[in-house]
Regions:
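Residue-level detector of alpha-helix initiation sites
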Residues: 29-30, 53, 130-132, 171-172, ...
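Glycine/small-residue-rich loop that forms an oxyanion/phosphate-binding "nest" at active or ligand-binding sites
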Residues: 94-157
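Beta1-alpha1 glycine-rich phosphate/pyrophosphate-binding loop at the start
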Residues: 21-90, 174-200, 273
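Single conserved hydrophobic/aromatic residue that forms the stacking wall/gate
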Residues: 1-12
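A conserved FAD-binding loop/helix module that cradles the flavin
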Residues: 176, 298-330
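FAD-site-proximal beta/loop scaffold in flavoenzymes
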Residues: 131, 136, 141-158, 257-303, ...
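A Rossmann-like FAD-binding core segment of flavoenzymes
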Residues: 84-113, 118-121, 182-282, 322-330
Length: 330
């Protein structure tokens, strides 16, 4: 934390509207909302900023079938709406806005919202989630919204009886491929390695599906089309003596190659792993900064489930309450 950085914050402090809160939650997936429910019930008057995607990744999921208590399953958006209402019922102040800068050098912790408002928080719960990764091809930007997607359940409907490609070799890629195969005429699964990393059950589903063709040891290196995606440039066994380049006609190109945690603004202060997941004390949501907790996918490289995110949101709120109590702040 250079003095230049703190000078910027001093200047921002003078210019910005500042609000003091006991408990600030950034992010509104299952982790953020569950933290808000528990913090609200503990009379911490929590303030939650919803972030770029209110409701989080689950709002892009049609059916959640593995969340306990819903034997028939529930839609992702419906589940998040229920959590939101529950948080509101217990007094959480839920707002739209994105955390754009952070200064966790000392308490109260300063979080800038939308580059225009400063929140000074005695405790901070980081529940900012993770965002889908892209390959980094220029064409991904060019065809964004015109055939390129990172969410099969959001956009699969547009590809009924069409041909699509899914990139990736893990569970997500296999799940997306199977989901799309229920809509599309044909699905290519483009896998860089000579094998799938997915769970056995997902591998079997993919390999047995008559609409899915798996292209092992293939790289997607570009897309083409006049008014949207019409095909993909592929390289088989890239860099090998028998490397082969060819094109396949497709209408849609779906990315399923993992996620990047939304932790960048906190990195100067909390520890992160090589991918960017926030490192917490084992078995707790505690970061190395006292009073700052991380919950949900932003701190979870292993499970990334709605129920585990909710569980860590609960833990973070309980930790925040204990921290404030020990400091005599409640």
């Amino acid at each position: 934390r250079s003095s230049a950085a703190s000078d910027v914050y001093k200047r921002q402090n003078i210019m910005m509207e500042t609000e003091k809160v006991k408990c600030l939650i950034v992010g509104s997936g299952p982790a953020g909302y569950t933290a808000a429910i528990y913090a609200g019930r503990a009379n911490l008057s929590p303030v939650l900023y919803a972030g770029l995607q209110p409701g989080g990744q689950l709002t892009t999921t049609t059916d959640v079938e593995n969340f306990p208590g819903y034997p028939q399953g529930i839609g992702g958006p419906e589940l998040m709406e229920d959590l939101r209402k529950q948080a509101e019922r217990f007094g959480a102040d839920l707002r739209y806005g994105v955390a754009t800068a952070a200064n966790l050098a000392e308490a109260p912790y300063k979080i800038t919202i939308d580059d225009e408002k400063m929140i000074e928080a005695e405790t901070l719960i980081i529940a900012t989630g993770a965002a889908a990764k892209y390959l980094g091809l220029e064409d991904e930007k060019k065809y964004a919204g015109m055939g390129v997607s990172a969410c099969a359940t959001c956009d699969g409907f547009f590809y009924r009886k069409k041909t699509v490609a899914v990139v990736g070799g893990g569970d997500t890629a296999c799940e997306e491929a199977v989901y799309l195969a229920g809509l599309a005429a044909k699905v290519y699964l483009i896998v860089r390695k000579p094998y799938l990393r997915a769970s056995k059950i997902m591998q079997e589903r993919v390999m047995k599906h008559d609409k899915i063709e798996v292209l092992f040891e293939h790289n997607a290196v570009g897309l083409f089309g006049e008014n949207g995606v019409e095909g993909v440039h592929l390289v088989q066994r890239m860099g090998e003596p028998d490397e082969k380049r060819y094109d396949v006609a497709i209408d849609g190109f779906f990315l399923a190659i993992g996620h990047k945690p939304n932790s960048d603004i906190f990195k100067p202060y909390v520890d992160t792993d090589e991918v960017g997941y926030i490192v917490t004390e084992p078995g707790t949501p505690r970061t190395k900064v006292p009073g700052v907790f991380a919950a949900g996918d932003v701190a979870d490289p292993h499970y990334r489930q709605a129920i585990t995110a909710a569980g860590t949101g609960c833990q973070a709120a309980i930790e925040a309450e204990r921290y404030l109590s020990a400091k005599g702040l409640i």
